[in-house]
């Protein structure tokens, strides 16, 4: 297939040459794409005529004779290719009506195909979204995530049905259009053939013309040229200059590309027909500006031709940088749009052109070359070919340049990053160049180079280690001013320590104590930089909150951590250390705010450990144990015992110490920790200090309980106890005298002003004495006490009904009113009072009914009164009346239920508000009306009402389940009511509103989790199980953990399907979810739970399964435990546990560990683990796994196993300590007795038994003798001398005064294999090598020795002076020959030089001129032909 090209017309300015005006480049920068008219090049470069001789008439003719530019199109046309018109005007031929109809049909078919592709893509996206919601792993506490996913599945299924219908419609429409197209095509065959012949003859005539030279002026490249990742942007030039040559593209394009570019193929539905349109489908070329646009639908074949043309244009010499930049932009854009053509190109034929571009001194041209190479890379093989072309040397030279070459250096670094993607091509020399960029503070590419270096730590850790890259990275951690950068580096280092692959190279090079240098410098500085101290504290806290972080701080018997806590002796550092450990122990977050503002207000808050998941507390217990072994308490006590103490600092220290002891007692062991040294000061007694500790301890523990006792509700117990005492005392022990005294003290009889009444005494009377039949009757007959209370609560008296919500005793009025109606309905005398009263209930019924009718004038039930007054209290009174048969009788007598039914009409907003206030107060036990009302509210159209009714049913069900009835009749009634409420609640699972479903689902979940479930519940669940499975409710897992629930779920095949799902994918998904959960809970802020339930790990299928005997039986029959066991034992017994880091194997191992852990966390499952000795294998993983996350997964799993007594016994036998509660019950925390084994990396084992004890010599002050015999400290003198030599001569070069070794190879400099042939064959004709005399080797040795001295900052100044003198004497003959190039190049690759030294060496030795000699030598050595294939 060929690209249509234009023939050229003769210009009136010259009869010998053709003038061709240039169009805008084929691929232009974004900012240069405009619609400006194409400039016409001047004729002064073609003829001797001046521009003034050109007449207006000739100019017009020139504009009319504009032709397409062919600077990038070959004049040779492939066979069977369609000819192009001789000019844009010739393409404007009249089309027939049939041709237009075919074109319109073709366009419409294409549009329909695009629409079909769009619909199918949309369908795929929706299916992917729907499939992502299928897998549900429930969180430990209730959430509505499963309902959100359920709603997403429903929406996705609805959208899929609609899209399927749309796809069918589009396919039918395409079929109809193709039928029309086929019919019209048959009638137009003759016409199309004639048109094709006519156009072909015209193009064949034009095809004989030759290509003409494009002329134009270029704007010069300015220094402000910038380069982004999309284009090399240059100022837009009017024309471009191409060499006058015929391009032969047959060498770079496969023969299979010989197809017609202008042929349109439209497949039929059956795939058998193909429509060919030639001339009639060509684009109208009438307007020249239309040709200046980028080809938007370039075919693969045409793109291949254009790539070849771009590459040919790079071979031209002495071209303007703008031209190269625009061609590079075009080539890159083409490669982006047609990446498939890369494999069809033979690139070796023009890679020499890339070399020439890189050798060009212009930064824009070099940047263009880098960018083109970057987009041509598609394999490691091609990268190897680039390295053979010395691309690594080019990159090193570019990176050594200053910031004025930003555009070139940026592209060179991006080229390195492209190498990283293929894990190939990054040499040691490139690594040193990147490190040099990182070391230079003023380098504009410093952060980009640092990012690259951090990536190389994962890709090529060994090379980074050889180049001592970690030392450079460590330097950024000491620059606390850039906290965001330091935190990223710290996170990267911690990740490097996570696996053996990278850890083995950096563990010895990285010293975690570098984070504490800011504290070390505090003693030597008068002023403390608060921002640096806060940033350092935050970094230390981040480190200690990560697994690898506290393993690094625990290294060498906790030596780094001991160094850290020793800074408690410095008061300035102590305040920051306290903040750090408060954060690490999850007591209180760091108080630092942005911009270094410190929060000086100190408010102690209690730790929330008792609300946390036990796995989170297990990690916290480990940190407490680490601090216990790091002399944390003694150093903190020394701070509190300072003579000159800061009271604020001491208060924080007490707070930290108190909370630390609390955590230690609850999470580590139940023994109290004794303080060895009492805190004492002359005027600050031991008793006072004890009082301060007691005060803060009481304050912290006031609202929390010891672990194991948290289930005891002391407040509720006290309330129940006081209530019973009050009832018994008031009922039995109140005599007549005291009763009369209480009535008198209430002041109800003395005054009608209710604000002066003693409402507490009134409430005591209603709760006690007035429940006595005799006393109530006496009070009614002899006083107006009851009457005045009735009058107070009558709506139309405007006493109670006129009290504001914000009044002092407003809630007391409501509370006493509820007790008043409860007391009256409890006795016959009270019922008589209510039956005789014709005011309160009738007025309420009348006022509410009138309000719903719209009569709110003078009515207390209106919108404003409901908002401002305590009118809601009347609805509570109605609820009290529904709680007894007598109360229901009162409501029935005054037809109050009719008023409630009226509320459902929703004729006014007041009716809805009344209903929302009434529903929560109704009791369902005594009135069928109430049950009907609630049933109606559950299905009413208004969503708010349904939510409120569903919530009310759930609350009443939990309340009913918590009560116990001893009477058989009452028990039977309770079961019936329970079934009714359960049925009503489970029906709500079918509601169309997700909010209603969520309320019902949560209520059912809470009922089961609370442990109040029974087989009666299971019977009620039976008919709704399928719906629960449909919405994927977490109730299913709670049911699965109960015997009756397992049977129900097994009947509907849920257990088998869920098991298959977990084995296939959910076990792996659980690993990611639980790790995210544990990471999220590293933060201090405790999550507020929606109901009283302790935080738990995400629910696991095998945990619920193994809580029943049926589940254990199923587990044994299926062999799942054996499968998990095999995965673990394969890892443990594979003899490569210390190095296995395959991602899939590690993920499978973690999944198996969690499964085994949850099986072992149950009373029935732990026996299975003991049978297979799995606990021992898990401990082995915890001690020796190479991947840190695997080690801590085993740690958490052992904590799960310790949740049973039998599990604790097994772990105790194997050297792990299990924590128990005050009731001697396991709490699920297991800690290793050998912390050194658990916290040691396999690459650096350490022991806590004396191997790293500090040698101390202690003298007796009286006689000067040694107190105890200590071994003398031995010094390794050879090692000290070696370190001294290394410091003075880091390059390890032999220093010989006034003498230089003639043999450079005898030094530590080595020559790579690829350059060895250069030294072995010096007989090649070289402009410099052949001129050497015998003494030249000694000069080279001298130069290289001087170069080695440049690495020593003491000798560098003299070396620069000396090498400059040699350069002035010998010049390029010595400094730019290829032999010296490679020797200096290898030295720069092997040794570290400062950035300014590297720039100096590159200017002398590693420059373009020397590199050009090397490339010339390579070409002669290889005798490479001009074109060859790989």
Curated annotation (Swiss-Prot):
It comes from Saccharomyces cerevisiae (strain ATCC 204508 / S288c) (Baker's yeast). GO terms for cellular component: cytosol; plasma membrane; TORC2 complex; vacuolar membrane. Residues 7-26, 35-44, 233-265 have a biased composition (Polar residues). Residues 1-62, 182-285 are annotated as: Disordered. One of its GO terms (biological process) is protein localization to plasma membrane. Residues 995-1100 form the N-terminal Ras-GEF domain. The gene is TSC11. The lineage of its organism: Eukaryota, Fungi, Dikarya, Ascomycota, Saccharomycotina. Residues 45-57 have a biased composition (Low complexity). This is Target of rapamycin complex 2 subunit TSC11. Essential component of TORC2, which regulates cell cycle-dependent polarization of the actin-cytoskeleton and cell wall integrity. TORC2 controls polarity of the actin cytoskeleton, which is required for orienting the secretory pathway toward discrete growth sites, via the RHO1/PKC1/MAPK cell integrity pathway. TSC11 may exert its functions through two distinct mechanisms, one mediated by AVO1 and the other mediated by AVO2 and SLM1. The modification Phosphoserine is found at residues 19, 81, 84, 87, 141.
């Amino acid at each position: 297939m060929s690209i249509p090209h234009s023939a050229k017309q003769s210009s009136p300015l010259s009869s010998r040459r053709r003038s061709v005006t240039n169009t805008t480049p084929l691929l232009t920068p974004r900012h240069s794409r405009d619609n400006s008219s194409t400039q016409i090049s001047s004729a002064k470069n073609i003829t001797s005529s001046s521009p003034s001789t050109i007449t207006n008439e000739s100019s017009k003719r020139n504009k009319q004779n504009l032709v397409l530019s062919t600077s990038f199109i070959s004049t040779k046309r492939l066979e069977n290719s369609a000819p192009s018109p001789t000019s844009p005007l010739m393409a404007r031929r009249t089309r027939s009506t049939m041709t237009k109809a075919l074109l319109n049909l073709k366009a419409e078919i294409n549009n329909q195909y695009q629409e079909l592709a769009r619909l199918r893509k949309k369908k795929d996206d929706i299916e992917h979204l729907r499939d992502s919601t299928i897998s549900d792993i429930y969180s430990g506490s209730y959430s509505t995530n499963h309902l959100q996913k359920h709603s997403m599945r429903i929406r996705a299924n609805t959208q899929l049905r609609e899209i399927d219908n749309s796809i069918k419609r589009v396919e039918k429409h395409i079929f109809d259009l193709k039928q029309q197209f086929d019919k019209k095509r048959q009638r137009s065959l003759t016409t199309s053939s004639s048109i094709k012949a006519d156009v072909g003859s015209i193009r064949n005539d034009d095809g004989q013309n030759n290509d003409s030279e494009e002329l134009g002026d270029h704007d010069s490249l300015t220094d402000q040229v910038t380069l982004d990742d999309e284009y090399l942007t240059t100022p837009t030039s009017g024309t471009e200059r191409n060499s006058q040559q015929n391009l032969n593209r047959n060498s770079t394009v496969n023969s299979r590309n010989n197809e017609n570019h202008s042929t349109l193929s439209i497949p039929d539905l059956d795939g058998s027909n193909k429509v060919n349109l030639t001339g009639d489908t060509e684009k109208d070329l009438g307007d020249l500006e239309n040709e200046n646009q980028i080809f938007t639908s370039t075919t693969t074949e045409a793109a291949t031709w254009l790539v070849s043309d771009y590459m040919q244009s790079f071979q031209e010499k002495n071209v303007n940088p703008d031209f190269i930049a625009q061609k590079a932009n075009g080539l890159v854009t083409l490669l982006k749009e047609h990446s498939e053509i890369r494999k069809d190109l033979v690139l070796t034929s023009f890679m020499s052109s890339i070399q020439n571009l890189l050798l060009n001194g212009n930064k824009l041209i070099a940047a263009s070359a880098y960018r083109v190479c970057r987009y041509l890379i598609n394999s490691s093989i091609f990268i190897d070919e680039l390295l053979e072309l010395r691309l690594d040397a080019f990159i090193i030279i570019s990176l050594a340049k200053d910031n004025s070459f930003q555009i070139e250096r940026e592209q060179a670094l991006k080229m390195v990053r492209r190498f990283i993607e293929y894990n190939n091509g990054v040499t040691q020399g490139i690594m040193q160049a990147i490190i040099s960029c990182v070391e230079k503070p003023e380098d504009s590419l410093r952060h980009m180079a640092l990012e690259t270096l951090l990536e190389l730590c994962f890709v090529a850790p060994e090379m980074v280690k050889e180049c001592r890259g970690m030392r450079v990275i460590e330097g950024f951690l000491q620059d606390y001013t850039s906290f965001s950068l330091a935190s990223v580096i710290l996170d990267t280092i911690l990740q490097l320590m996570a696996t053996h692959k990278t850890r083995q190279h950096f563990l010895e090079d990285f010293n975690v104590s570098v984070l504490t240098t800011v504290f070390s410098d505090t003693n030597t500085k008068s002023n403390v930089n608060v921002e640096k101290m806060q940033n350092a504290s935050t970094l230390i806290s981040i480190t200690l909150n990560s697994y690898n972080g506290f393993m690094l701080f625990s290294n060498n018997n906790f030596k780094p951590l001991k160094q850290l806590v020793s800074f408690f002796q410095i008061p300035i550092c102590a305040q920051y250390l306290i903040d750090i450990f408060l954060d690490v122990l999850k007591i209180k977050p760091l108080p630092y705010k942005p911009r270094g503002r410190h929060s000086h207000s100190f408010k102690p808050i209690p730790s929330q450990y008792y609300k946390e998941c036990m796995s989170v507390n297990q990690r916290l217990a480990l940190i407490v144990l680490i601090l216990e072994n790091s002399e944390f308490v003694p150093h903190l006590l020394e701070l509190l015992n300072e003579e000159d103490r800061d009271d604020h600092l001491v208060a924080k220290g007490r707070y930290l110490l108190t909370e630390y002891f609390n955590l230690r007692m609850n999470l580590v062991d139940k023994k109290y920790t004794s303080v060895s040294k009492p805190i004492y000061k002359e005027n600050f007694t031991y008793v006072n200090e004890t009082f301060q500790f007691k005060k803060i301890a009481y304050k912290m523990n006031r609202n929390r309980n010891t672990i194991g006792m948290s289930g005891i509700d002391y407040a509720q117990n006290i309330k129940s106890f006081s209530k019973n005492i009050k009832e018994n005392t008031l009922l039995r022990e109140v005599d007549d005298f005291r009763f009369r005294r209480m009535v008198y003290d209430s002041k109800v009889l003395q005054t009608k002003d209710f604000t002066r009444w003693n409402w507490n005494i009134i409430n005591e009377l209603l709760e006690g004495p007035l429940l006595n039949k005799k006393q109530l009757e006496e009070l009614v007959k002899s006083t107006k006490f009851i009457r005045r209370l009735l009058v107070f609560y009558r709506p139309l008296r405007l006493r109670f009904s006129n009290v504001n919500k914000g009044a002092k005793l407003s809630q007391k009025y409501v509370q006493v009113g509820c007790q008043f109606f409860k007391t009256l309905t409890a006795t016959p005398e009270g019922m008589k009072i209510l039956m005789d009263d014709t005011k309160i209930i009738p007025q309420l019924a009348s006022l509410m009914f009138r309000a719903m009718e719209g009569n709110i004038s003078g009515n207390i039930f209106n919108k404003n009164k409901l908002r401002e007054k305590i009118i809601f209290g009347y609805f509570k009174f109605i609820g009290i009346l529904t709680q007894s048969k007598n109360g229901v009788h009162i409501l029935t007598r005054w037809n109050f239920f009719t008023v409630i039914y009226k509320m459902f009409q929703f004729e006014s907003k007041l009716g809805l508000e009344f209903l929302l206030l009434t529903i929560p107060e109704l009791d369902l036990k005594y009135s069928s009306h109430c049950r009907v009302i609630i049933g109606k509210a559950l299905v009413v159209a208004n969503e708010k009402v349904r939510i409120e009714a569903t919530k009310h049913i759930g609350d009443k069900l939990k309340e009913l389940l918590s009560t116990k009835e001893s009477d058989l009749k009452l028990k039977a009634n309770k079961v019936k009511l329970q079934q009714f409420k359960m049925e009503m609640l489970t029906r709500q699972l079918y509601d169309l509103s997700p909010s209603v479903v969520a309320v019902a689902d949560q209520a059912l979940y809470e009922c089961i989790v609370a442990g109040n479930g029974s087989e009666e519940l299971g019977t009620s669940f039976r008919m709704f199980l399928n719906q629960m499975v449909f919405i994927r409710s977490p109730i299913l897992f709670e049911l699965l953990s109960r015997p009756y629930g397992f049977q129900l779920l097994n009947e509907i095949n849920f257990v088998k399907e869920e098991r298959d799902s977990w084995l296939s994918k959910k076990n792996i998904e659980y690993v990611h979810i639980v790790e995210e959960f544990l990471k999220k809970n590293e933060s201090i802020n405790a999550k507020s739970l929606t109901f009283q339930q302790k935080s738990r790990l995400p629910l696991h299928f095998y945990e619920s399964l193994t809580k029943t005997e049926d589940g254990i039986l199923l587990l044994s029959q299926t062999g799942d435990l054996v499968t998990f066991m095999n995965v673990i034992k394969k890892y443990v017994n594979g003899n490569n546990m210390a190095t296995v880091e395959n991602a899939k194997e590690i993920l499978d191992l973690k999944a198996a560990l969690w499964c085994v852990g949850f099986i072992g966390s149950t009373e029935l499952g732990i026996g299975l683990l003991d049978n297979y000795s799995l606990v021992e294998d898990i401990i082995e993983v915890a001690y020796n796994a190479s991947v840190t996350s695997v080690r801590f997964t085993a740690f958490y799993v052992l904590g799960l196993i310790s949740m049973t007594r039998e599990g604790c016994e097994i772990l105790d036998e194997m050297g792990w300590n299990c924590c128990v509660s005050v009731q001697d019950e396991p709490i699920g925390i297991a800690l290793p007795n050998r912390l050194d084994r658990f916290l040691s990396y396999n690459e650096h084992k350490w022991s806590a038994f004396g191997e790293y004890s500090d040698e101390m010599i202690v003298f007796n002050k009286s006689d000067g003798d040694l107190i105890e015999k200590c071994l003398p400290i031995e010094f390794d003198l050879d090692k000290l001398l070696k370190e001294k030599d290394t410091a003075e001569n880091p390059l390890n070069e032999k220093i010989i005064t006034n003498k230089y070794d003639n043999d450079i190879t005898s030094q530590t400099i080595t020559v790579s294999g690829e350059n060895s042939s250069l030294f072995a064959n010096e007989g090649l004709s070289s402009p410099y090598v052949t001129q050497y005399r015998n003494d030249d080797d000694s000069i080279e040795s001298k130069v290289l020795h001087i170069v080695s001295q440049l690495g020593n900052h003491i000798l560098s100044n003299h070396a620069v002076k000396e090498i400059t003198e040699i350069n002035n004497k010998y010049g390029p003959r010595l400094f730019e020959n290829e032999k010296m190039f490679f020797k200096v190049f290898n030295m720069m690759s092997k040794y570290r030089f400062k950035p300014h030294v590297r720039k100096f060496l590159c200017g002398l030795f590693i420059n373009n001129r020397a590199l050009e000699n090397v490339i010339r030598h390579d070409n002669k050595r290889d005798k490479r032909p001009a074109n060859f294939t790989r």
